């Protein structure tokens, strides 16, 4: 037995002595730049397209619905006060700590992701949709906050604190959208799956133009709708005509309630120009129903969604009579 142990030990030492000693092996698990294969680039683009999904599914909805008087905050039994995060938008008395408006940084991160593609040496067909997404993120910052940073530089130079006047950002967006629109896809189905196409960029430009006098005003309190003139109105109408005349969209192809039902992804809804898809497994985050659900919905079996839910709804927002 002792002889066997000695032989095994000697054999092990010989293996160590003759083993690989050249450790200068190129590392292929680390890349100084993003891989440029089509699969890798599409994955990178998809991360840009879906970047805003989580915020869009809750905080963006809360900020828009509560501040526009469509809905108002409620606090049944003293719950869901959350420091006034839901009541402040309705009262137009925001605090920088409110979660309902604390997502400007997410838009900045989306611009950074887009810049990684835009500033690389990839083909222009990948850069154009990335520029469209960057314009979308920039538009939301400008539309919601007024002054906003123009994040069109390298990652190192992006600074969320270097804000530009709203009018300058609006003119930058106009120039950017006019440049990329001719080079984007005309496949309408792409827009319904969060992939930016020509019609998404055109619709974004139309939104920019229809509110042009507001964006050009020195400040919102200096804007007077009764006396303002819109130099971009004809251009806005022309863009809308182009979208309509494409024949790829139809407002009356199905009942309104089906367009926003749980199975609408299979219906090819023809009036959706640009949409963010959600599901319960790979694309989660849609919480629109939660805010308006019965607070103790988990006690219902089945609930009005057709199944028993393990958690209760939020029940912290209610629709105002004017919108009901």
Regions found by a protein language model. Give the residues of each.
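Membrane-proximal, proline-rich intrinsically disordered regions
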Residues: 20-68, 96, 230, 259
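Glycine-centered coil turns and helix-coil junctions that link the paired helices
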Residues: 120, 141, 212-219
């Amino acid at each position: 037995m002792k002889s066997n142990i000695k032989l095994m030990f000697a054999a092990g030492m010989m293996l160590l002595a003759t083993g690989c000693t050249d450790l200068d092996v190129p590392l292929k698990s680390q890349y100084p730049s993003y891989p440029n294969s089509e699969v890798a680039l599409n994955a990178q683009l998809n991360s840009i397209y879906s970047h805003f999904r989580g915020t869009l599914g809750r905080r963006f909805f809360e900020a828009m619905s509560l501040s526009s008087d469509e809905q108002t905050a409620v606090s049944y039994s003293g719950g869901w006060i959350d420091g006034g995060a839901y009541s402040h938008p309705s009262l137009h008395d925001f605090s920088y700590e409110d979660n309902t408006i604390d997502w400007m940084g997410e838009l900045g991160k989306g611009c950074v992701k887009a810049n990684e593609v835009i500033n690389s040496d990839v083909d222009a067909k990948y850069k154009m949709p990335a520029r469209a997404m960057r314009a979308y993120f920039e538009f939301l910052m400008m539309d919601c906050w007024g002054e906003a940073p123009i994040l069109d530089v390298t990652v190192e130079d992006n600074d969320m604190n270097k804000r530009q006047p709203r009018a300058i950002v609006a003119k930058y967006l106009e120039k950017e959208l006019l440049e990329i629109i001719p080079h984007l896809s005309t496949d309408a189905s792409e827009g319904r799956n969060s992939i930016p196409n020509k019609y998404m960029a055109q619709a974004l430009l139309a939104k920019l133009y229809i509110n042009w006098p507001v964006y050009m005003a020195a400040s919102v309190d200096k804007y007077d709708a009764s006396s303002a003139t819109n130099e971009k109105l004809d251009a806005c109408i022309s863009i809308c005509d182009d979208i309509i005349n494409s024949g790829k969209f139809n407002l009356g192809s199905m009942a309104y309630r089906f367009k926003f039902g749980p199975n609408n992804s299979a219906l090819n809804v023809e009036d959706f120009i640009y949409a963010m898809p959600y599901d319960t497994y790979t694309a989660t985050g849609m919480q629109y129903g939660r805010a308006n659900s019965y607070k103790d919905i988990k006690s219902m079996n089945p609930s009005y969604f057709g199944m028993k839910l393990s958690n209760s709804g939020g029940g912290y927002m209610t629709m105002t009579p004017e919108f009901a």
